[in-house]
């Protein structure tokens, strides 16, 4: 009799545990589906650890986006990964440059410009490589990303120095953090960087050979999808994004870049002492479409590729 009671108790425990395990699986599955639905409905914004994204980071951290609207940041370290996310509709908004966007549009991706940004790019030479002028890039390695503003800038450098294109070895390094690390480790002769990575390079006494600002090129942009964005819910999200972005730009311009050093350090992973290398006059403009002449430059360069 006692043996029978033990068997019944053990069976009860097994059945109970089985039900508990199945119930846990069901709850976890339901939670995952709920999270996926919420993420799908949210406005997902792809960003990089670069200074042009500062208004977005500020709006997120300081709750300048309407809290009634679900806006989520998706962090990337390479522009190509943002391109893939945009092409696969895994994000609705992304930070990019005109060359990359015009190429995506040429390939059939349905994108529209939300705004230009204050991003600028610099061609920086490794001080140990003794590259004092663009002509010294002959037989040197240049880190960049193909079909981007960095690729365009590489061509401009080669053409202006009257070098043979095949004599400058373009090395595709997509991750902006890896690109800077290669300079710090003396693994690359020259690189094309934006802020704040360029500021780190300047602090380390590496030489700037080319700057898009001096070429009157404003190539940074933020884009959104065309398809699936015509509903009222998406329109409301974009309006909230625009208002939050504009507020963030106004705040940075009012208080100054130094006031947000901790935010830059948090998202861009650079030490704040490098920020002293960035001009105090740097401003962030409100939402405004890119200039037609800059779009034309991107299209003209792509037409030759």
Language model feature labels by segment:
Residues 43-45, 139-144, 227-234, 246-253, ...:
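Second-shell loop/turn segments in exported
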Residues 19-26, 69, 148-169, 240-279:
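Ligand-binding clefts/hinges and TM-proximal coupling segments of bilobed small-molecule sensing domains
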Residues 15-16:
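C-terminal motif of bacterial Sec signal peptides marking the signal peptidase cleavage site
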Residues 2-7:
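Sec-dependent signal peptide recognition
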Residues 99-100, 167-264:
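Pocket-lining segment of extracytoplasmic ligand-binding domains
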């Amino acid at each position: 009799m006692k043996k029978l009671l033990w068997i019944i108790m053990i069976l009860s425990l097994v059945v109970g545990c089985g039900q508990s395990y199945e119930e846990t699986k069901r709850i976890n599955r339901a939670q995952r589906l709920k999270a996926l639905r919420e993420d799908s409905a949210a406005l997902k914004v792809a960003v990089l650890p670069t200074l042009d994204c500062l208004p977005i980071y500020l709006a997120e951290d300081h709750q300048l986006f309407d809290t009634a609207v679900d806006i989520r940041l998706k962090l990337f370290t390479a522009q190509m990964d943002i391109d893939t996310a945009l092409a696969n509709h895994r994000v609705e908004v992304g930070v990019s440059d005109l060359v990359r966007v015009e190429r995506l549009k040429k390939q059939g991706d349905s994108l529209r410009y939300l705004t230009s940004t204050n991003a600028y790019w610099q061609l920086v030479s490794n001080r140990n490589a003794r590259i004092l002028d663009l002509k010294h890039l002959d037989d040197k390695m240049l880190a960049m990303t193909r079909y981007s503003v960095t690729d365009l800038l590489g061509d401009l450098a080669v053409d202006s120095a009257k070098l043979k294109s095949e004599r400058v070895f373009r090395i595709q390094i997509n991750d902006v953090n890896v690109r800077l690390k290669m300079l710090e480790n003396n693994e690359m002769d020259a690189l094309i960087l934006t802020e704040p990575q360029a500021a780190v390079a300047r602090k380390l006494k590496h030489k700037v050979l080319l700057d898009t600002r001096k070429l009157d090129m404003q190539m940074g942009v933020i884009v959104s999808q065309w398809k699936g964005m015509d509903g009222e819910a998406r329109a409301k999200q974009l309006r909230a994004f625009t208002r939050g972005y504009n507020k963030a730009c106004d705040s940075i311009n009012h208080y100054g870049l130094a006031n947000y050093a901790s935010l830059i350090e948090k998202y861009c992973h650079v030490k704040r002492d490098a920020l002293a290398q960035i001009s105090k006059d740097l401003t962030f403009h409100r939402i405004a479409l890119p200039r037609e002449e800059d779009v034309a430059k991107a299209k003209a360069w792509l037409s030759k590729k």
